[in-house]
Amino acid sequence: MKLVLKISGKFFDEENIENFISLRNTIKNIVNEGHRLAIVSGGGSTARKYIKIGRELGVNEAHLDLLGIWASRLNAYLLTFILSDLSYMKVPENLEEFIEKWESEKVVITGGFQPGQSTATVAALVSEAIAADYLILATNVDGVYDKDPRYNKDAKLLSKLNTETLKKILETSQSVKAGTYELLDPLAIKIIERSKIKVIVMNYKRLNKILDIIHGKDIGSIIEPM
């Protein structure tokens, strides 16, 4: 099975060593079972910090995007070094380079590719390029909710939904400014739909459950492409 794991930048913000150990052990188990894996990392608070400073000083959005991309690559290199016995040691900087490195049979870890593109879009592009069986979005919530759980205590977790439902949920909460992407942006959804990529949203504190997903168990929210 081929998997793409998109790890939210919030994973890195927590600086929780146990989370990193769990991730490393999980990836080793996935590889030992004979599965292929690519990882895409978000930029997290490191990206937001530099983007905030740059924006206040008048830096344009394209250059702010570059700051976010470099922050996401820094996080990607951290994972690359943690998984040095399994991973390709150079973080790809574009899709062509990723495809080339994928042929190495190693775990390929990347961050952002280009301005105007979220790391969620990168994850969707990578999933499309390798014909992934699943794109797994590991974030700080248990799945997709019918409304933003940060601000609505009555928000309900949706175990299954399609991309049309997801678009309606995200309509009022998304921004296209650098450093503000959440979950999936419109371009990522478009790629998911055109290539019929199955997406799973789960909490990164449950990364040890990825093998359960591979073995057919429902974890988090499953998003079916329309």
UniProtKB/Swiss-Prot annotation:
Keywords: ATP-binding, Cytoplasm, Kinase, Nucleotide-binding, Pyrimidine biosynthesis, Transferase. It is found in: Cytoplasm. CDD domains: AAK_UMPK-PyrH-Pf. The keyword Cytoplasm applies. Its EC number is 2.7.4.22. The keyword Cytoplasm applies. One of its GO terms (cellular component) is cytoplasm. Pathway: Pyrimidine metabolism; CTP biosynthesis via de novo pathway; UDP from UMP (UMPK route): step 1/1. GO terms for biological process: 'de novo' CTP biosynthetic process; UDP biosynthetic process. InterPro entries: AceGlu_kinase-like_sf, Asp/Glu/Uridylate_kinase, Uridylate_kinase, Uridylate_kinase_arch/spir. ATP binds at residues 6-10, 44, 48, 139-140, 145, 148. Gene3D superfamilies: Acetylglutamate kinase-like (3.40.1160.10). UMP binds at residues 43, 65, 113-119. Signal peptide: none annotated. It catalyses: UMP + ATP = UDP + ADP. Its main location: cytoplasm. Inhibited by UTP. Catalyzes the reversible phosphorylation of UMP to UDP. PANTHER family: URIDYLATE KINASE, URIDYLATE KINASE PUMPKIN, CHLOROPLASTIC. Belongs to the UMP kinase family. NCBIfam families: pyrH_arch (TIGR02076). Homohexamer. This is Uridylate kinase. It comes from Sulfurisphaera tokodaii (strain DSM 16993 / JCM 10545 / NBRC 100140 / 7) (Sulfolobus tokodaii). The gene is pyrH.
